[in-house]
């Protein structure tokens, strides 16, 4: 399954919520005037009762799109989350949040996860002093992530840091923006993660 490269707001409208796919801190309804309409020429205002399966599938698609993960990757993350000790849904979110591209985004080096993923693929990011280009690397407690010396003057990184200052840096990450360097202190607790995600629906979907 190929990665989606079309209009970002269309995906957010499809899920009925802001997936944080576009840079900026404006509310979703300000980013797009069609916020409460499904995409398509004949998109109608949202309404009507959805089936249980439809709700579960939509939640999975929403989370998959938030983190920019393909279907097979997402399925593998779920299997790993179910294998280890703890609540499967919470484990799944921790695995997604621990991806290198997500951590780069959370540290404020990329204005979106897609931009953070591009920084990694272009070898503009170092992990514990070594340049890497695999966005899906699982970052561990104590790992140090930094912008490579050759990329520190990129305007998009400076712009991303300004946006991050408005958005806020999570407590489970420590960042020194003057050095363009940060430390992944620990995987986040569920209380640190987005409340609008209902991971129990995803667990119900995969449990069938």
Curated annotation (Swiss-Prot):
Give all residue intervals belonging to the S4 RNA-binding domain.
Answer: 98-160
Question: Keyword annotations for this protein?
Answer: Ribonucleoprotein, Ribosomal protein, RNA-binding, rRNA-binding
Annotated Gene Ontology MF terms?
Answer: rRNA binding; structural constituent of ribosome
Task: Name a single GO cellular component.
Answer: small ribosomal subunit
GO BP term, pick one: ribosomal small subunit biogenesis
Q: What SMART domains does the database record attribute to this sequence?
A: Ribosomal_S4, S4
Region annotation Disordered: residue ranges? 24-52
Q: Which PANTHER family match?
A: 30S 40S RIBOSOMAL PROTEIN (PTHR11831), SMALL RIBOSOMAL SUBUNIT PROTEIN US4M (PTHR11831:SF4)
How the protein assembles, per its UniProt entry? Part of the 30S ribosomal subunit. Contacts protein S5. The interaction surface between S4 and S5 is involved in control of translational fidelity.
Q: What role does it play?
A: One of the primary rRNA binding proteins, it binds directly to 16S rRNA where it nucleates assembly of the body of the 30S subunit.
What protein family is recorded? Belongs to the universal ribosomal protein uS4 family.
Protein name in UniProt? Small ribosomal subunit protein uS4
